[in-house]
Amino acid sequence: MSADLVALLYLAAGVLFILALRGLSSPETSRQGNLFGMVGMAIAIVTTLAYHPPADLGAWGLVVLGLAIGASTGAVIARRVPMTAMPELVAAFHSLVGMAAVLVAAGALYAPAAFDIGTVGAIHTSSLIEMSLGVAIGAVTFTGSVIAFLKLSARMSGAPIILPARHAINIALAAAIVALIVFFARTESHLAFWLLAFAAFAFGVLIIIPIGGADMPVVISMLNSYSGWAAAGIGFTLGNSALIITGALVGSSGAILSYIMCKGMNRSFISVILGGFGGEVAGPAAGKEQRPVKQGSAEDAAFILKNAGKVIIVPGYGMAVAQAQHALREMADRLKKEGVTVRYAIHPVAGRMPGHMNVLLAEANVPYDEVFELDDINSEFGQADVAFVIGANDVTNPAAKEDPSSPIYGMPVLEVWKAGTVMFSKRSLSSGYAGIDNTLFYRDNTMMLFGDAKKMTEEIVKAL
């Protein structure tokens, strides 16, 4: 296969990956986006094997074995992992990309001739720089993603873990990583390579553990970006333009998404990375006097909903925890049969990963044309008879609009309080990730529905 044909095929794969990203940006075209991505990846793999065929039968066996293991594992995951576990699954996949970057860099260090980058002890300087950057980014991505996976899957506390003098430790470790990159690029020291890898592994842990569970959408986007740049680093080491293109696409899209997520929380990217914000708060904000709230039953809610003309449902992380999306869809179907107009309002940072609520609603087969983003539906709350909030706390807090002293002041929120009646399904009056009371709880037009979100929604369905 000629180099020109390979370049053309890699370009075609890159275009398909761009189309995949475009398709995955909307639920209506997500299946098409997945198909584009699959075809692009197939072209890239076949082209690579044809241009650099394994040297012997044993090498072919390893390639086939690797493909079989990867394909079968992917198939099992696709069939068995529930949609509610998508955030931790995404984090786990990011970790694999990071570790792949580390292993490829290690392979290039010990067998440079196989990568056509020189010989042992005489590797090209440019390749050493690429390898050092690849292993640093890859190692940070791996351990950072593992910590994110543990937090998201509740195998580790989602609250921030604050170490004494953590900023000084991180600065010192970052400086050591930079120094090791320079030293390795100048000396090709194997010891420096592994010290760099372990320093980056530690750095990945230290920058993620102080980040609270509710900041995970930004973390997932950030790790997505890291994994892309790690893949691009692998591409440079392997001399594979398709991998460079793909890595750059993932890296840049992840960075853009991180910016969008930060904007949606009215936070700076640096403030998220510095951590210490986003911890789970077990009870009402400390020092706050308990205020009376209106509490309703499932029967009360069903009566009001049934007689409403327009209902806007606002899902949040509480829906994901309770896995209430199917019950919510059933409730919406019952209301539509009664002639009620039903819409869903999604905040960009609701949940624990970008698009978390969209994924869960799609799993419950909620029609795409009923789901709206914040900017598209905020103006409709004033015309809604009922806003049904299910586990969306800080993203519905009026303090973001009305209280300049609030930590979340200026954060874009869903203006649910403008609806005729607000129904808030929640276990208790506990604070959200910002650690502040939601003043929505105490408004005259708010009715609290205490209890498990799924059970409460199912009881409302029965009452309907």
Segment roles from a protein language model:
Residues 14-18, 36-48, 62, 66-70, ...:
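Alpha-helical transmembrane segments in multi-pass membrane proteins
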Residues 48-64, 76-85, 102-120:
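Transmembrane alpha-helix boundary signature
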Residues 16-29, 71-90, 145-160, 203-216, ...:
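C-terminal ends of transmembrane helices
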Residues 249-308:
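Membrane-interfacial segments at transmembrane helix termini in multi-pass membrane proteins
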Residues 289-464:
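Structured cytosolic domains appended to multi-pass membrane proteins
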Residues 107-121, 186-191, 218, 225-245:
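Transmembrane helix-loop junctions at the membrane interface of multipass transporters and ion channels
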Residues 31-40, 63-65, 85-97, 160-171, ...:
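Cytoplasmic-side transmembrane-helix entry/capping segments in multi-pass membrane proteins
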Residues 1-14, 54-72, 127-142, 188-199:
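Structural signature of hydrophobic alpha-helical transmembrane segments
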